[in-house]
Curated annotation (Swiss-Prot):
Species of the source: Streptococcus suis (strain 05ZYH33)
Family assignment from sequence similarity: Belongs to the SprT family.
Official protein name in the record: Protein SprT-like
Organism taxonomic ancestry: Bacteria, Bacillati, Bacillota, Bacilli, Lactobacillales
InterPro entries linked to this entry: SprT-like_domain (IPR006640), SprT_Zn_ribbon (IPR035240), Uncharacterised_SprT-like (IPR023524)
Pfam families from the UniProt entry: SprT-like, Zn_ribbon_SprT
Amino acid sequence: MDLNKYVQEVSLQDFGKEFRHVAIWNRRLRSTGGRFFPRDGHLDFNPKHLEEQGLEVFRKIVRHELCHYHLYFEKKGYRHGDRDFKELLAAVDGLRYAPQLEQATKPSLIYCCQSCGQVYQRKRRIDLKKYRCGKCRGKLTLKE
Protein backbone atom coordinates (compact mmCIF):
# COMPACT_ATOMS: atom_id res chain seq x y z
CA MET A 1 0.00 0.00 0.00
CA ASP A 2 1.27 3.47 -0.89
CA LEU A 3 0.73 5.18 2.48
CA ASN A 4 1.22 8.74 1.26
CA LYS A 5 -1.36 8.30 -1.51
CA TYR A 6 -3.81 6.63 0.89
CA VAL A 7 -3.53 9.47 3.45
CA GLN A 8 -4.08 12.03 0.66
CA GLU A 9 -7.24 10.17 -0.45
CA VAL A 10 -8.62 9.99 3.11
CA SER A 11 -7.90 13.68 3.60
CA LEU A 12 -9.77 14.67 0.44
CA GLN A 13 -12.71 12.29 0.97
CA ASP A 14 -13.28 12.77 4.71
CA PHE A 15 -12.06 16.35 5.28
CA GLY A 16 -12.36 17.93 1.83
CA LYS A 17 -8.83 19.28 2.31
CA GLU A 18 -5.48 18.47 0.78
CA PHE A 19 -2.67 16.68 2.64
CA ARG A 20 0.54 18.40 1.50
CA HIS A 21 3.20 16.70 3.62
CA VAL A 22 4.64 13.19 3.98
CA ALA A 23 3.20 10.11 5.68
CA ILE A 24 5.61 7.33 6.61
CA TRP A 25 5.53 3.92 8.29
CA ASN A 26 7.26 3.67 11.66
CA ARG A 27 7.64 0.11 12.98
CA ARG A 28 9.10 1.35 16.28
CA LEU A 29 5.77 2.75 17.47
CA ARG A 30 4.39 0.49 20.18
CA SER A 31 1.41 1.93 22.03
CA THR A 32 0.19 4.42 19.44
CA GLY A 33 -1.39 4.12 16.02
CA GLY A 34 0.21 7.25 14.62
CA ARG A 35 1.92 10.55 15.39
CA PHE A 36 1.71 14.09 14.00
CA PHE A 37 4.83 16.26 13.99
CA PRO A 38 3.92 19.98 14.02
CA ARG A 39 7.52 21.05 13.35
CA ASP A 40 7.58 19.69 9.80
CA GLY A 41 4.00 18.46 9.31
CA HIS A 42 4.74 14.81 8.61
CA LEU A 43 2.74 11.87 9.97
CA ASP A 44 4.04 8.52 11.28
CA PHE A 45 1.86 5.41 11.27
CA ASN A 46 2.24 2.02 12.92
CA PRO A 47 1.98 -0.70 10.23
CA LYS A 48 1.07 -3.31 12.87
CA HIS A 49 -2.36 -1.69 13.26
CA LEU A 50 -3.10 -2.21 9.57
CA GLU A 51 -1.87 -5.82 9.71
CA GLU A 52 -3.75 -6.79 12.88
CA GLN A 53 -6.93 -4.67 12.84
CA GLY A 54 -7.53 -4.19 9.13
CA LEU A 55 -8.19 -1.26 6.83
CA GLU A 56 -11.39 0.00 8.52
CA VAL A 57 -9.71 0.59 11.89
CA PHE A 58 -6.56 1.92 10.22
CA ARG A 59 -8.63 4.48 8.30
CA LYS A 60 -10.02 5.77 11.61
CA ILE A 61 -6.46 6.09 12.96
CA VAL A 62 -5.51 8.08 9.83
CA ARG A 63 -8.54 10.34 10.42
CA HIS A 64 -7.36 10.94 14.00
CA GLU A 65 -3.92 12.06 12.86
CA LEU A 66 -5.40 14.17 10.06
CA CYS A 67 -7.53 15.98 12.67
CA HIS A 68 -4.30 17.03 14.40
CA TYR A 69 -2.78 17.95 11.03
CA HIS A 70 -5.61 20.09 9.63
CA LEU A 71 -6.42 21.85 12.91
CA TYR A 72 -2.77 22.76 13.47
CA PHE A 73 -2.47 24.41 10.06
CA GLU A 74 -5.80 26.21 10.56
CA LYS A 75 -4.38 27.58 13.84
CA LYS A 76 -7.12 25.93 15.90
CA GLY A 77 -6.89 23.68 18.95
CA TYR A 78 -5.17 20.52 17.67
CA ARG A 79 -4.39 18.82 21.00
CA HIS A 80 -6.44 15.95 22.45
CA GLY A 81 -8.07 18.09 25.14
CA ASP A 82 -9.14 20.93 22.82
CA ARG A 83 -12.80 21.35 21.90
CA ASP A 84 -12.00 21.88 18.19
CA PHE A 85 -10.16 18.55 18.10
CA LYS A 86 -12.92 16.61 19.85
CA GLU A 87 -15.62 18.07 17.60
CA LEU A 88 -13.75 17.39 14.35
CA LEU A 89 -12.83 13.86 15.46
CA ALA A 90 -16.49 13.10 16.19
CA ALA A 91 -17.59 14.64 12.87
CA VAL A 92 -15.25 12.45 10.79
CA ASP A 93 -15.71 9.30 12.94
CA GLY A 94 -12.07 8.96 13.95
CA LEU A 95 -10.78 6.86 16.82
CA ARG A 96 -10.06 8.58 20.14
CA TYR A 97 -7.67 5.79 21.19
CA ALA A 98 -5.85 3.21 19.07
CA PRO A 99 -6.91 -0.37 19.85
CA GLN A 100 -4.51 -2.52 21.86
CA LEU A 101 -2.07 -4.54 19.77
CA GLU A 102 -1.09 -8.15 20.44
CA GLN A 103 2.06 -7.93 22.50
CA ALA A 104 4.80 -10.49 22.38
CA THR A 105 5.39 -10.70 26.12
CA LYS A 106 8.57 -12.02 27.59
CA PRO A 107 8.17 -15.10 29.76
CA SER A 108 7.74 -14.09 33.38
CA LEU A 109 10.37 -15.08 35.90
CA ILE A 110 9.11 -16.16 39.30
CA TYR A 111 11.28 -15.70 42.36
CA CYS A 112 10.34 -17.20 45.72
CA CYS A 113 11.63 -16.46 49.22
CA GLN A 114 13.07 -19.54 50.95
CA SER A 115 12.07 -18.28 54.41
CA CYS A 116 8.54 -16.86 54.15
CA GLY A 117 7.43 -18.11 50.71
CA GLN A 118 6.76 -14.60 49.30
CA VAL A 119 6.49 -14.78 45.48
CA TYR A 120 7.86 -12.11 43.12
CA GLN A 121 7.10 -11.99 39.40
CA ARG A 122 9.63 -10.20 37.18
CA LYS A 123 10.29 -9.75 33.46
CA ARG A 124 14.03 -9.27 33.96
CA ARG A 125 16.50 -11.47 35.76
CA ILE A 126 17.80 -10.25 39.11
CA ASP A 127 21.11 -10.96 40.84
CA LEU A 128 20.22 -13.43 43.60
CA LYS A 129 23.45 -12.65 45.47
CA LYS A 130 22.56 -8.96 45.63
CA TYR A 131 18.78 -8.95 46.29
CA ARG A 132 16.79 -10.35 49.23
CA CYS A 133 13.11 -10.70 50.15
CA GLY A 134 11.47 -7.34 50.89
CA LYS A 135 9.25 -8.90 53.53
CA CYS A 136 11.67 -10.90 55.71
CA ARG A 137 15.14 -10.37 54.15
CA GLY A 138 15.29 -14.09 53.31
CA LYS A 139 17.19 -15.59 50.38
CA LEU A 140 15.45 -15.66 46.97
CA THR A 141 15.41 -18.55 44.52
CA LEU A 142 14.29 -18.73 40.90
CA LYS A 143 11.34 -21.09 40.37
CA GLU A 144 11.55 -23.22 37.24
